[in-house]
């Protein structure tokens, strides 16, 4: 899932991460016991940037996800939604979930519009195209159900998420294939109703370990 989230974000941006505003992690999670989230963004360039931020709700964070309507207009709020970010400066963007307190996990796209300040000022006077100096970056925010039910099944190296909230799962230990070295590690996000088989770690070995996070709680599985 993490690979799909990264691919989605890169497809949205149309540019490489090294060329864009630093918006931190591609995917962010708001746990069921929290209604706020903070993301730090940084302008690592030598010129000021004009940043505008927009939110969209998605049917899924995967490649086939579609933009859908929010349950209420103020379901997810943020501040600031627009700012001028000086060269080499940072800013904290805060998100507030005010949607239904139900058993449904919700997914949002955070769209960051980044433009060089000098070009933005020129646009106001001349409206000239500045496509080469601007960027549109997409990241994902997952809001866990307010009534989270964490359940899973594990058998023969495969984890299945039978609950209603995304799990972060991992395996570590001896590599399944000698060509991969002696020690291997795998990390994935596992959405509700999905299964994942570990393919690099020999989970059948006595030294092979499987674990997961339920929100901030670490759970050993094997």
Curated annotation (Swiss-Prot):
Induction (free text): Negatively regulated by H-NS. Positively regulated by IHF and EcpR.
Keyword Disulfide bond: no
Residues annotated as signal peptide: 1-20
Domain of life: Bacteria
Gene3D superfamilies: Immunoglobulins
One Pfam family, short name: EcpB_C
Keywords for the protein's UniProt record, in alphabetical order: Chaperone, Fimbrium biogenesis, Signal
Family that this chain belongs to: Belongs to the EcpB/EcpE family.
Function: Part of the ecpRABCDE operon, which encodes the E.coli common pilus (ECP). ECP is found in both commensal and pathogenic strains and plays a dual role in early-stage biofilm development and host cell recognition.
Protein name per its UniProtKB record: Probable fimbrial chaperone EcpB
Taxonomic source organism: Escherichia coli O157:H7
Gene name, Swiss-Prot/TrEMBL: ecpB
């Amino acid at each position: 899932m993490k690979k799909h989230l990264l691919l989605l974000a890169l497809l949205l941006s149309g540019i490489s991460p090294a060329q864009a505003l630093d918006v931190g992690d591609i995917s962010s999670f708001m746990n069921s016991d929290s209604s706020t989230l903070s993301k730090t963004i940084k302008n690592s360039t030598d010129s000021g940037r004009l940043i505008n931020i927009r939110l969209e709700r998605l049917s899924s964070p995967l490649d086939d996800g579609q933009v859908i309507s929010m349950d209420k207009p103020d379901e997810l709020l943020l501040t600031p939604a627009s700012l001028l970010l000086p060269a080499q400066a940072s800013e904290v963007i805060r998100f507030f979930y005010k949607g239904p307190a139900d058993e449904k996990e919700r997914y949002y796209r955070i769209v960051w519009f980044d433009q060089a300040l000098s070009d933005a000022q020129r646009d106001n006077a001349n409206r000239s195209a500045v496509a080469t100096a601007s960027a549109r970056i997409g990241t994902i925010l997952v809001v866990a159900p307010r009534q989270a039910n964490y359940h899973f099944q594990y058998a023969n190296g495969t984890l299945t998420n039978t609950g209603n909230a995304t799990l972060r799962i991992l395996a570590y230990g001896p590599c399944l294939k000698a060509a991969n070295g002696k020690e291997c590690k795998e990390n994935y996000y596992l959405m509700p109703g999905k299964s994942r088989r570990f393919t690099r770690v020999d989970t059948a070995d006595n030294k092979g370990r499987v674990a997961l996070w339920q929100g901030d709680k670490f759970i050993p599985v094997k």
